[in-house]
């Protein structure tokens, strides 16, 4: 169980600033909204009630990690100090909490909803919310609001709402998406232009928001597993690995070495699968049609391996609490061992037709630069963070599975541009092959599934687990009250920090560069919208 320190709201901002400056807690790993219910006279004195937030922080300097929480009992006007001036990603994280719980973050510059319609009534993640009564099915188009609210604290302690315009009347604003192919899903960017130069981007999320975190509260633990595959569908195995690992950690379950080997190999096959699709999609975005076919051709070999063992190609449904759904197919080892030399032998062709292409290089080199400091402040993990010089690989920071038993290099570049983000992923394909090669002939015997009770109840407490997904750190925060269903199950989306940073990355770039920048950030919209 994770120990979480409580801080009263009045002292929150000063304490967070102290942790950032003195303890070097520069990485806001996760920010989770909570509804601990209404206070009752029967409650024990230590029972936490009210609406609040759980923060997970980490120092990229010392590696120290800490979790904090705060709460307010006023449900009519819950107010908590904003930390968006300390960590840039808090801007989007706090908007998400406001959207779900109605908590107003004092000092936040843009207190709009993040996922739901602007005319949505109520806050759906509150335990006492009834959305069907307040929100009948609406078939009308949503009105676009250009007004934001900045919540300020007056010297006398009162709150002041200051309305601000997103765009000026003279600004030329273009919509990129939500139906534009280069947005890689239903994501809408409202782009302010001066000629061809980008001056500002307003990212609009939520077009395929499905309320997965709300659904989890009415599902048993085994039932929640299926929904993780529907988040980042190019990292389905890794997502479910994180959730299973979190539940197993909470229940004190130690899976067999065979399961650890299988999960690690599957995670790395998934990483290669995702990076090959990244290569193809980026090539198509930049007009390199031949390169597009290379990635899809070779990705099929991995999907065939998945289908044979898991029964699915994209959505595998393979990991389960205590192990995996079925043992490896008899052909699994043979087919994986055939794929390794094949991929190694052909990767040079990928570089010949695209990496070394002068047009591709001119579209990516020096374009969309993200500094290391901004990567950390926005929480841009994965290939994006490592391309900016931040060694943030969860497999190295907090080893899980059998990553502590294999030799592999964490790929880090320092340029922070589109080309560096591209090269990180291409190099990671080779490192994933190296990891798989060390494991494939050494899979130990043993059970592929631990015996579980028919009804799974997780001990009361708070738990966090994370894996290195194809796009970065995918985290799971679980709060249990000892029931067969989670009290709160929150996912740290890998893609939300990437979209949060896109305004900073693109300012001053040309509109055509937005395509290359979005392609190399490699976000997946269902992972963001959840």
Curated annotation (Swiss-Prot):
Pfam families: Complex1_30kDa, Complex1_49kDa. Keywords: Cell inner membrane, Cell membrane, Membrane, Multifunctional enzyme, NAD, Quinone, Translocase, Transport. Residues 171-530 are annotated as: NADH dehydrogenase I subunit D. Residues 1-144 are annotated as: NADH dehydrogenase I subunit C. It catalyses: a quinone + NADH + 5 H(+)(in) = a quinol + NAD(+) + 4 H(+)(out). It is a peripheral membrane protein. GO terms for cellular component: NADH dehydrogenase complex; plasma membrane. Its EC number is 7.1.1.-. It comes from the Bacteria. The keyword Hydrolase does not apply. InterPro entries: NADH_Q_OxRdtase_suD (IPR001135), NADH_quin_OxRdtase_su_C/D-like (IPR037232), NADH_UbQ_OxRdtase_30kDa_su (IPR001268), NADH_UbQ_OxRdtase_CS (IPR020396), NDH-1_subunit_CD (IPR026662), NDH1_su_D/H (IPR022885), NiFe-Hase_large (IPR029014). HAMAP family: NDH1_NuoCD_2 (MF_01397), NDH1_NuoD (MF_01358). NDH-1 is composed of 13 different subunits. Subunits NuoB, CD, E, F, and G constitute the peripheral sector of the complex. This is NADH-quinone oxidoreductase subunit C/D. It comes from Bacteroides thetaiotaomicron (strain ATCC 29148 / DSM 2079 / JCM 5827 / CCUG 10774 / NCTC 10582 / VPI-5482 / E50). The lineage of its organism: Bacteria, Pseudomonadati, Bacteroidota, Bacteroidia, Bacteroidales. The gene is nuoC.
């Amino acid at each position: 169980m994770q120990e979480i320190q409580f801080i009263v709201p009045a002292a929150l901002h000063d304490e967070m600033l102290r942790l950032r400056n003195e303890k070097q807690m520069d990485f806001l790993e996760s920010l989770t909204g909570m509804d601990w219910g209404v206070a009752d006279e029967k409650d024990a004195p230590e029972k936490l009630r009210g609406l609040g937030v759980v923060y997970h922080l980490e120092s990229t300097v010392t590696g120290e990690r800490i979790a904090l929480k705060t709460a307010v009992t006023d449900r009519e006007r819950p107010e908590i100090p904003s930390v968006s001036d300390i960590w840039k990603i808090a801007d989007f994280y706090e908007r998400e909490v406001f959207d779900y719980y109605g908590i107003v973050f004092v000092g936040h510059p843009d207190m709009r909803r993040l996922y739901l319609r602007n005319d949505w009534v109520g806050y759906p993640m509150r335990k006492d919310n009834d959305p069907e009564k307040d929100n009948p099915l609406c078939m009308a188009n949503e009105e676009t609001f250009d007004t934001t609210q900045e919540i300020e604290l007056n010297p006398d302690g009162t709150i002041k709402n200051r309305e601000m315009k997103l765009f000026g009347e003279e600004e030329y604003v273009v919509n990129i998406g939500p139906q534009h192919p280069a947005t890689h899903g239903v994501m809408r960017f409202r782009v302010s232009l001066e000629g061809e130069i980008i001056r500002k981007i307003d990212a609009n999320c939520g077009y395929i928001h499905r309320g997965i975190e709300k659904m989890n509260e009415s599902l048993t633990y085994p039932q929640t597993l299926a929904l993780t595959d529907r988040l980042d569908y190019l990292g389905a195995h890794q997502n479910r690995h994180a959730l299973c690992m979190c539940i197993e950690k909470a229940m004190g379950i130690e899976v067999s070495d065979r399961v650890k080997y299988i999960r690690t190999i599957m995670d790395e096959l998934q990483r290669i699968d995702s990076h090959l699709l990244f290569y193809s999609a980026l090539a198509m975005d930049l007009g390199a049609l031949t390169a597009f076919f290379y990635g899809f051709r070779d990705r099929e070999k991995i999907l065939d391996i998945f289908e044979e063992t898991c029964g699915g190609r994209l959505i595998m449904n393979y990991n389960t609490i205590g192990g995996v759904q079925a043992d490896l197919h008899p052909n699994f080892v043979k087919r994986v061992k055939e794929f390794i030399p094949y991929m190694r032998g052909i990767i040079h062709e990928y570089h010949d037709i695209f990496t070394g292409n002068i047009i591709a290089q001119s579209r990516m080199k020096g374009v969309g630069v993200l500094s290391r400091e901004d990567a950390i402040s926005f929480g841009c993990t994965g290939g994006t963070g490592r391309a900016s010089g931040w060694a943030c690989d969860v497999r190295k920071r907090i080893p899980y599975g059998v990553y502590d038993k294999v030799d592999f290099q964490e790929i880090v570049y320092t340029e922070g541009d589109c080309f560096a983000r591209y090269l990180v992923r291409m190099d990671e394909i080779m490192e994933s092959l190296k990891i798989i090669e060390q494991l494939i002939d050494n899979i130990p015997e043993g059970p592929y599934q631990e015996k579980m009770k028919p009804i799974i109840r997780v001990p009361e407490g708070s738990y966090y687990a994370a894996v290195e997904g194809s796009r970065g750190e995918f985290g799971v925060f679980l709060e249990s009250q000892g029931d067969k269903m989670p009290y709160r199950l929150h996912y740290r989306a890998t893609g939300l920090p990437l979209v949060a940073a896109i305004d900073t990355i693109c300012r001053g770039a040309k509109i055509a560069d937005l395509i290359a920048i979005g392609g190399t950030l490699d976000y997946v919209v269902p992972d963001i919208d959840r």
